[in-house]
Amino acid sequence: MALLQIAEPGQSPKPHERRLAVGIDLGTTNSLVAAVRSGVAEPLPDAQGRLILPSAVRYHAERAEVGESARAAAAEDPFNTVISVKRLMGRGLEDVKQLGEQLPYRFRQGESHMPFIETVQGLKSPVEVSADILRELRQRAETTLGGELVGAVITVPAYFDDAQRQATKDAARLAGLNVLRLLNEPTAAAVAYGLDKGAEGLVAIYDLGGGTFDISILRLTRGVFEVLATGGDTALGGDDFDHAIAGWVIEEAGLSADLDPGSQRQLLQIACAAKERLTDEASVRVAYGDWSGELSRATLDELIEPFVARSLKSCRRAVRDSGVDLEEIRSVVMVGGSTRVPRVRTAVGELFGCEPLTDIDPDQVVAIGAAIQADALAGNKRGEELLLLDVIPLSLGLETMGGLMEKVIPRNTTIPVARAQEFTTYKDGQTAMMIHVLQGERELVKDCRSLARFELRGIPPMVAGAAKIRVTFQVDADGLLGVSARELSSGVEASIQVKPSYGLTDGEIARMLKDSFDYAGDDKAARALREQQVEAQRLLEAVQSALDVDGERLLDEEERLAIAAQMDTLRELAGGSDTAAIENQIKRLSQVTDAFAARRMDATVKAALSGRRLNEIEE
């Protein structure tokens, strides 16, 4: 008799057989793939022994060239060589046009405003370009490990919004990868350091890569990595340092800033090389065309100071959001190649009052942490899976009457999470409701970001306020949002997986947070005004409806005129901006209609009891 093989969900049916899973750091400038081998997480090399894969793709008519050779061709073939594609992930065409000087491509608009890059191989979306990089990493891993991968943990900046995360998952699917988890880059770094050091306490993760900056404040306790707060800038990184140096060269050499794409790429490569050499040297000679000059580390520090200051501002905000003091943070983990710049390390050390941790190569630490988590999720470490408590960077909510933003999940809420809230109809007989999903910190819809819209139909006709619609927001472990709405009496339901066509523009998250603090007082006043205006409109409609049905029957002319006068006054005030006056007039109209409401109730009760015996009523 054959025995049925039974295995735990996610575990191998062969207990001694390891399931091959990898961690991938899909970076703006460089990418890596790592795996746990013989109990140690380590980056996987290519055939030439190189660990780092430049995030560059050069398109030929029949094939795609990925990595070092593609990056080397950027100056001679700029239109067909795509670099820093991470900056384009989840963005719309209007957003990427703002980066035109930094990304000299020929863009075309595709469906849902998605940008496409013109190449000799045809139009390529950022998702397709990222997929080519991921495919190269997958092939490297399968060759090195000698088998097919069961999945990968792919890291993303903590500040990536829903669109950017979804774009990353789509790229992985195109590359033939099963995504076990999208992991925030700072959390991945904490995994690497937490396991290696057995660290506990409050830790800051300062992650400055080629194109993005993240700062996260974490509490590490016995294998639990809790993100207390996160911040950063989706358009700040080492690329900005390169552009600052390039600008200095143009100014010193007296060149025109309007360079052709090939010359621009060549100048940026020279700038990047100078930046890297200044990590170990006090000054370097920079040559471009017929010009050459001396660039000192002190001059570099001056050039990049505005960018360093921007990162420190985000750090202070994240510390404040976490509810802890700077002095309580006992260590700072440095992540990303741009943290090798001496001025960056010095500035971070001065802010936090401690020597930054650089034990693990900052280029490798994220991939190593992702590999450790991938190994656990693949079922190779029973009983040792880490509990990772990430957070959402901006509040999620929906639009209510009057253009108000009702927050359902506040920012810095730990994910995965599900929250529900009940809403009701605004008008009598309303049978449908538009659900408008929003992201942001402001009180008014116009100041927040629209994520998605969907409609709940089939609501039973009822008087305004009688229907109960439960709206549930669910954010999964990857930070992706789903929203459902259900009318409780009938059970009719509608839902949506939020997949916006493009993400937040440069610095928009930081701006949204800043605005929420700067305009907090104004926003509350505006919200209070809108709420009173909505209540005034609701009361006016309810009174008018009652007058149309019972006014002639239950009121004399003097009473009708008195109510009409108060209604006219409320209509006039509701069109203004005096919140207190509207509130007081609502009270006056309510008072003048109290007797009318009581008579309507008496008439309704009398009609209900008419023709029935006393014993029938008592029963």
Swiss-Prot record:
GO biological process terms on file: iron-sulfur cluster assembly
Protein's name in the database: Chaperone protein HscA homolog
Keyword vocabulary terms for this entry: ATP-binding, Chaperone, Nucleotide-binding, Stress response
Annotated family: Belongs to the heat shock protein 70 family.
HAMAP family named among the record's database cross-references: HscA
Presence of keyword Phosphoprotein: no
Pfam families the record matches: HSP70
PANTHER family in the record: HEAT SHOCK PROTEIN 70KDA
Keyword set includes Chaperone: yes
Gene Ontology molecular function terms on file: ATP binding; ATP hydrolysis activity; ATP-dependent protein folding chaperone; unfolded protein binding
Role summary: Chaperone involved in the maturation of iron-sulfur cluster-containing proteins. Has a low intrinsic ATPase activity which is markedly stimulated by HscB.
Superkingdom of this protein's organism: Bacteria
